[in-house]
Amino acid sequence: MTLFDPERGRPIVAPPCDAPGCWAGAPGAYREGSDLYVVYRLRGPRPKRGYEVIIAASRDGARFDTVWSADKDRFGAESIERCAIAHVGDIWRLYVSFVRHNDRRWRIGLIESRAVDAFDPADLVIVLDPLDLGLAAVKDPWFRREGEGWLMFTSYGTLPLTGGTGLHDTGDALSTGRTISASGLATSPDGRRWTWQGAVLLPSASGWDSFTTRLSTAVRDGDGWLGLYDGSASLAENYEERCGLVRSRDLHHWERVNADGPSIGTVRGPGGVRYVDITAVGDVFYEYTRADGAHELRVAHTS
């Protein structure tokens, strides 16, 4: 099954440099009527890493203009990854995943604002902290509503059974090979106070997604849901995950559609797809691997 053809997608943000480790992507999409928003991050090779988060807006889905941005120093961060945006009543919300300089752990914070162009990183409040959850890391949030409440899906890493000494020395516990990198769920009545519910999608016992499974979005599929996730088989593929499909009746329990390999994009090399987000009307944003190894942000539409 193919929801969209990544080769036919249109590049909308180029990477900041033309080499592996140079990325524009990790998008979080939000549509409100005719207004389309995408929040994404820019990244350079180490030691720069994810250095800027940007919100862009479009009225026609073709031209995207920057309405807000902030560099990682304003968050006291070593790196920024996937973020999410939502508009609730008269309040805009920006959820940011970042590594703090002081302890080098991935966590998720929330900033609220009356306007989409007025977020102040000084107002950030931590909503999911790995120290509180007994985890090595938590990052890459995205959302769905469930009744009057909220579901937040994240990437997370478990603490190693052998102990955590040195786990955060690189500022990225998920890139050490010492954690289980899986997809988890938190629930909230209001989008501010969150309760961790645990795993919803774990790596397979063997195969192409046995190292990482990062659920990235979900769309309606009849009476249930079709989910897209990033998978990898080893630490060597950590920054070149591929896109697989899973199904769910309730957003809480997921089953793989194809265990043999990725379902969207190439198996390896250029043309790889990761960090997909899809709006309710079918706007598709994704990070795409170019021939030079850099990643660009593309937009497409579901078939």
Residue positions per predicted region:
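Carbohydrate-active catalytic/glycan-binding domains of CAZyme proteins
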Residues: M1-S303
